[in-house]
Curated annotation (Swiss-Prot):
Keywords: DNA-directed RNA polymerase, Nucleus, Transcription. GO terms for molecular function: DNA binding; DNA-directed RNA polymerase activity; protein dimerization activity. Disulfide bonds: none annotated. This is DNA-directed RNA polymerases I and III subunit rpc19. GO terms for biological process: transcription by RNA polymerase I; transcription by RNA polymerase III; transcription elongation by RNA polymerase I. GO terms for cellular component: RNA polymerase I complex; RNA polymerase III complex. Its main location: nucleus. The keyword Cell division does not apply.
């Protein structure tokens, strides 16, 4: 299953993902709603570490971890386990939104400092 075809994520996913992003580059391997592995194609430690960081700041997330299976493999595996009141897909979407908000804040702060 891909992120685009995931039933719980489709509507909320489309609200913030830029049109240029290929949602088919994320494959979902789900054991249960609260526990899933997401396989990102063409992503590396940059996104993996950032997602892991923001996910672990979320009190509804019990576990987050990522791995790059092999340096020559262009995949990043992200495992998320949540508490029962939120799904792994919802926490991933929240994490991506948090990264977007943090990036926007850094960009605006940097530009404001340049203007002074």
């Amino acid at each position: 299953m891909t992120l685009a075809s995931a039933p719980a994520a489709t509507e909320s996913c489309n609200s913030f993902i830029p049109p240029s992003f290929d949602v088919n580059k994320v494959e979902i391997i789900s054991d249960r709603p609260d526990c899933a592995t997401f396989i990102f194609t063409d992503e590396d430690h940059t996104l993996g570490n950032a997602l892991h960081y923001v996910l672990m700041k979320n009190p509804k997330v019990d576990f987050s971890g990522y791995s790059i299976p092999h340096p020559s493999d262009n995949r990043m595996n992200l495992r998320i386990q949540t508490k029962s009141n939120i799904t792994a897909q919802e926490s991933l979407l929240q994490g991506l939104t948090d990264i977007k908000d943090i990036s926007r804040h850094i960009f605006e702060t940097f530009n404001n400092a340049l203007d002074q």
